[in-house]
């Protein structure tokens, strides 16, 4: 079951499992813009934190927030921080979390959702309808690329 969770719950998972070696601070929002650049105005939008629960145990997370319009994409929503605990992978929970994040974005009026996934999780994003929008390149947290999907 997917439900909204608190910042503290998702931050714990991100800091301890998804990005344990990250040197920059982990915050509720990302200033990243689609296909490059940063804009602090992204932090003016509402962030939503989602958790996937099995038998009342939190086994996966994802978040999303609106981003400033760019010439590349217009009104857009960032999916960020997808993580499913190792023993629960391969069951479709990551895809369900991405789809639930897309539903939140659509309900808020967004038509495009984008992310910056690690190459190790690309298959999950592809199953959820994302297409690659850039080449893969090293980042602070792994090898990543920009990807997007239309919310219809």
Give the residues covered by each predicted segment:
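A short beta-loop-alpha structural element at the N-terminal edge
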Residues: 1-13
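Active-site rim helix/loop that mediates acceptor-substrate recognition in acyltransferases
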Residues: 14-54
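Conserved beta-strand in the GNAT
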Residues: 51, 57-70, 76-78, 83
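Conserved acetyl-CoA pyrophosphate-binding loop and the N-cap/start of the following alpha-helix
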Residues: 88, 92-100
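Conserved short alpha-helix immediately C-terminal to the canonical SAM/SAH-binding motif I
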Residues: 97, 121-124
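Conserved catalytic-core motifs of GNAT/GCN5-like acyltransferases
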Residues: 114-116, 131-149
């Amino acid at each position: 079951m997917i439900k909204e969770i608190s910042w503290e719950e998702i931050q714990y998972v991100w800091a301890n499992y998804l990005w344990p070696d990250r040197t920059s601070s982990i915050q509720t929002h990302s200033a990243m813009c689609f296909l490059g650049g940063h804009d602090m105005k992204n932090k003016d939008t509402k962030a939503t934190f989602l958790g996937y629960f099995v038998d009342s145990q939190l086994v996966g997370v994802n978040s999303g927030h609106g981003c400033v319009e760019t010439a590349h994409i217009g009104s857009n929503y960032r999916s960020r921080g997808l993580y499913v605990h190792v023993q629960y992978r391969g069951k479709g929970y990551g895809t369900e979390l991405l789809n639930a994040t897309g539903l939140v974005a659509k309900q808020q009026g967004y038509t495009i959702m984008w992310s910056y996934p690690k190459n190790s999780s690309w298959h999950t994003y592809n199953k959820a309808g994302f297409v690659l929008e850039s080449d893969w390149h090293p980042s602070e947290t792994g090898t990543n690329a920009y990807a997007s999907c239309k919310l219809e």
